[in-house]
Amino acid sequence: MSKLIIAEKPSVAKSIASALGASSRADGFYEGSGLLVSWCVGHLVSPMDAGGYDERFKKWRYDDLPILPESFRYVLAPGKEDAFENLRALMDRPDVDTIVNACDAGREGELIFRLVYEMTGCRKPVLRLWISSMEDSAIREGFSDLRPGADYEALYQSALCRQKADWLVGINATRLFSVLYHRTLNVGRVQTPTLAMLAERDAKITLFHKEKYHLLRLTLNGAEAVSEKFTDPAEAEQAAAMCKGVTVTCTSVTKEQKKEQPPKLYDLTTLQREANRLFGYTAKQTLDYAQSLYEKKLLTYPRTDSRYLTSDMAETASCVIHLAAKLPPFDGCSNFFPLVETMISDKDVSDHHAIIPTMEIEKADLKLLPVGERNLLLLVCCKLLCASAELYVYEAVTATFDCGGYSFTAKGKRILSEGWREIDRIFRAFLKEKPADGDGGTLPDFTEGQIFDSAEIAVTEHFTQPPKTYTEDTLLSAMENAGKDDIPDEAERKGLGTPATRAAIIEKLVTAGFVERKGKSLIPTKAGINLVTVLPEPLTSPMLTAEWEQKLTEIAKGGADPDTFMDGIRTMVQELVSTYSCISEDGKKLFAPEKEVIGTCPRCGQPVYEGKKNFACSDRSCGFVLWKNDRFWTSRKKELTKKMATDLLKKGRTNVKGMWSEKKQATYDAAVILNDTGGKYINFKLEFPKRKAGGNGR
């Protein structure tokens, strides 16, 4: 008898087949050593659209809301029928007695497999392959320790709840507000609160009022000491005058030894954030690069929320550290003795450990990797080396001075042991980036009571700064920490979305036209700000959505009831529809398309705008309208264009070529003259070009 192993992607199936000896390639699967290895192509099965439940749901109407299926139905994803039928046929083979779920080891991977398994009607026993690396040794080790599929039932229920909640909120809220505002407004359970955070930051920036302030700066033996802020420029100038030419006294010198622990390893979110800071990569780009490196066996599983390793990985981690230390530019680090134990914490690892390189980096030619993947792999290597390096130790020095009765402060530091920061500095130099720690250089050896005959004094002007726009780095951090203060400390999941879904959420907002990228910044568009303005708090509250995400995590751990969660979602949707049945006229204007002024009304002097079917005066009581398909134009097989209308308003005439004469069955050119008599309809006259005088001289 044979086991059928189902992976999430063809590339993963190929690696599994190679590692387990299924070397014979057939149509849609590998075979060998008593195994069949096949694959999904992402999600093969998807929730049915609302129109599939009832014909009337194919049209968007308020009266049909809310749409709350008693039981959810599923359909094959378009274009993936062949992949599904291949898996169904393999599951039905009489020599297959066991199915192995080898889809990605996480919530979505579990859902992808289970929906296929359920739709085929297969009832053969299921085992689960759960691995964090695509190395051959990791695959073989995982296959020798397969777990019963039933052990992951709670994870599957969590995935189902997430999918159903997204469907219920997305379908109902999107239809509700699209119908009310006569424009497609995509509303999502997670993406809308994310948009709300962007809009809130944009409002703070818009409303920010900058304030001027001044500082006095003393230059002493090459070091700079700074005063407190002066809000009154006259007071700052007066203080500077009092300090000129007078002695300066060092009133205190404090020295404190400080230590900085090595940074933690990367989880997906911190990797995406740093890749955005250093390389400008979007969250999606980083995830794509990391996934590709994982499938090439160079990186461990990327969709993780842990920043530690388990104790059974200590030996492997030590080997990988020494391999990474041989790679340029890290081979220039001095006296590197890794401390693996600082990265180990079994209690802080749930499904997957932190992201680290694999042993395969020893054999890989990194120069052959695409530049994005190479940068990311070196970034992960750098973090692994930093995390296992020694403490960064320095002496923080603060010196205070008195000059003319005013106090000044100078700060600096003296490095005692560079530790992990040496690796970070070398890597940043390799990238031609500034060191991460640029705070304070070395101060001269000041002593308390030291007197300086005089010092250079300068007044500098400054302004308070508004909040910074979100970048993908800072937005990912905000998403991760949303609702953190309102969820118990012991809660495992906090924030909007998961490490695996946040990149897609940002991309959806950009694609929908609610957010735009300007350099590294993410800026909400006018449509995005208006959407947040009109939506109720249950849809825009990051805290509420973070609580939902927390509940999904509890369901995955078996600590919460899926039915109770879904009842809460259904109740929220029902209340949403019953509360929002109509909107004000001002509300409707929020999403009205912006009209372009094309000229001035010849009757009343008000602006004339282009509409869908006409060019009309903005003052409705005036009544001046130029219809695009006026009979004057259609009888001549023409349509009034924006340029023609602009000419008529500006010059009272427009030249038109190729007008049709029904009588002569031919085209002709003429000038069309605006002949407005003040009636309901506008009249036009034709003026033909004068023919050139001809003749033979008789």
Question: Where would I find each of the regions flagged by the language model?
Answer:
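Intrinsically disordered, low-complexity regulatory segments
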Residues: 1-163, 167, 338, 466
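C-terminal or mid-to-C-terminal helical accessory/interaction module adjacent to the motor/catalytic core
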Residues: 138-218, 255-256
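Metal- or metallocofactor-binding catalytic centers and their adjacent structured scaffolds
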Residues: 150, 233-266, 272
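Conserved short loop/turn motifs at secondary-structure junctions
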Residues: 1-2, 102-105, 182-184, 255-264, ...
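Basic, low-complexity terminal or inter-domain segments flanking catalytic cores
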Residues: 2-4, 80, 91, 174, ...
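Amphipathic alpha-helical transducer elements in NTP-driven molecular machines
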Residues: 10-17, 34-37, 41, 77-88, ...
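Flexible glycine-/small-residue-rich
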Residues: 7-8, 39-41, 103, 169, ...
